[in-house]
A protein has these predicted regions:
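Active-site metal-coordination segments of metallo-dependent hydrolases
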Residues: 159-172, 208-214
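Post-HEXXH active-site segment of zinc metalloproteases
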Residues: 72-114, 150-155
């Protein structure tokens, strides 16, 4: 059995991952012999009332990795990443060395993902339970201005976790993965019973307690610490909302948010450096982190009940804009969306202007259609039944089969999205 070699610029995970250098998802856990399980995962029998453990596990994995693909191809952050990446490829293809300007610019985006592994520190291999968080701002010679989350238990420190782009992307993928599982259950049973809610909540708890999964659980830990009484699905919705906002906010509005963040930081030297990075369109993970804390303070000082927060999460962008407005950043949801669309389309025009050898035929058009389909929800699972989709499961023996049809759990998501499995 042959496996595609995992490169440095990939998401973590042994069962599957996205290669950020090519935008291709690789599913390692399954081979072409597992197509029956994959079909049951993608196309559950509606109303069957049969819980299929293997199919649910496959659905979770595919949803997790597909979230990475959509975050890379349908967000303002993702398109900037791809444009810079392809400009670097074009420069190298033309004979430029690795110290060329295009490569250096692309490495700024890569560094935001790579920094997590270089900065995370674990002091005790114990379950993450009954912890509190402390936050610090520091300057790192290699990665610039960094916000660190310190996980404290009693007088001891369990771990230091950087607020990295990787931690934001993985938190969003986990949120979508678990919401996707809930959708699978709803399709099969007609509802998500208390038993399955508790089971999904237990799955999230196991992720949050794992000190070796800090790239996955950092943002989820922040949410459960600050909003302990929200339901499991409201907490997932909140993580998805702040991730979607941070990945899609336009450069102009990012500067407005940077000014608000600036006022919330006491260290004048470091806040200047951090806000300069934000004004250049970098450090979007910091936006998610600070917006989450702004929402917490906004709900506390306005004495919003858990039910009130839950109600506002039905329109998460409105909640985020209300929280920012409370701290002096006047953003209107409709303007946030329109400016985000404008900047995304500008990046698309740049991508079309590059040599097409770095993107497969039809990929740019697929990105645009997927973005339109994803526009009004923070969860990809909420649109699965309404998208137009072709996902190809390609074996390494050069055989392509269309595995997903219009009645699948994924609906019909626009191709080309390629998942490679071993033959």
């Amino acid at each position: 059995m042959r496996r595609i070699k995992k490169l440095v610029m990939c998401s973590p995970g042994d069962d599957g991952y996205i290669d950020y250098g090519s935008s291709i998802v690789n599913i390692v856990k399954y081979t072409s012999r597992d197509k029956k399980v994959l079909r049951r995962a993608i196309k559950p029998k509606i109303g069957s009332g049969r819980f299929d453990v293997a199919a649910v596990q496959a659905a979770r994995l595919i949803t997790h990795e597909y979230t990475h693909y959509l975050d890379l191809t349908t967000t303002v952050w993702g398109l900037e990443f791809i444009v810079r990446r392809n400009l670097a490829y074009q420069a190298i293809d033309a004979g430029a060395d690795i110290e060329s300007k295009a490569v250096e610019v692309a490495m700024l985006n890569y560094a935001e993902i790579l920094m997590h592994k270089g900065l995370v520190k674990v002091y005790g291999h114990v379950p993450i339970e009954d912890v509190v968080t402390k936050h610090s701002l520091s300057r790192n010679e290699k990665y610039g201005t960094i916000i660190m989350i310190h996980l404290m238990k009693g007088e001891g420190r369990i771990a230091d976790v950087p607020v990295s782009m990787l931690s934001l992307l993985e938190a969003n993928a986990v949120a979508n993965e678990l919401m996707g599982e809930a959708l699978w259950i709803e399709r099969v049973f007609g509802e998500v019973s208390s038993f399955h809610k508790n089971r999904i909540s237990s799955n999230l708890d196991s992720i949050m307690k794992n000190v070796n999964a800090l790239e996955y659980n950092a943002f989820h830990l922040l949410v459960v610490i600050h909003f302990p009484r929200l339901t499991i699905f409201d907490r997932l919705r909140l993580v998805g909302a702040v991730a979607d906002f941070a990945l899609n906010i336009s450069g102009m509005h990012l500067s407005h948010v940077a000014n608000t963040i600036f006022r919330s930081i006491l260290n004048s030297t470091l806040r200047n450096a951090l806000c300069n990075e934000l004004c250049r369109g970098m450090s979007r993970q910091v936006v998610a982190f600070k917006v989450l804390l702004f929402i917490y303070q906004y709900t506390q000082e306005n004495e919003l009940s858990d039910e009130g927060v839950s109600e506002k999460l039905k329109s998460p962008l409105e909640l985020i804009c209300s929280a920012l407005q409370y701290f002096g950043c006047d953003l209107q949801a409709v303007n946030v969306r329109s400016m985000s669309d404008f900047e995304y389309c500008f990046s698309v025009s740049m991508l079309r202007g590059l040599r097409r050898k770095f993107e497969p035929a039809g990929h740019v058009e697929a990105m645009l259609r997927n973005r339109r389909a994803r526009k009004n929800t923070v969860f990809i699972s909420e649109k699965f039944g309404f998208l137009s989709c072709l996902i190809f499961i390609c074996s390494t023996i050069s055989t392509s089969r269309c595995l997903i049809d219009k009645d699948s759990i994924f609906g019909r998501i626009m191709s080309p999205f390629m998942m490679f499995i071993a033959s």
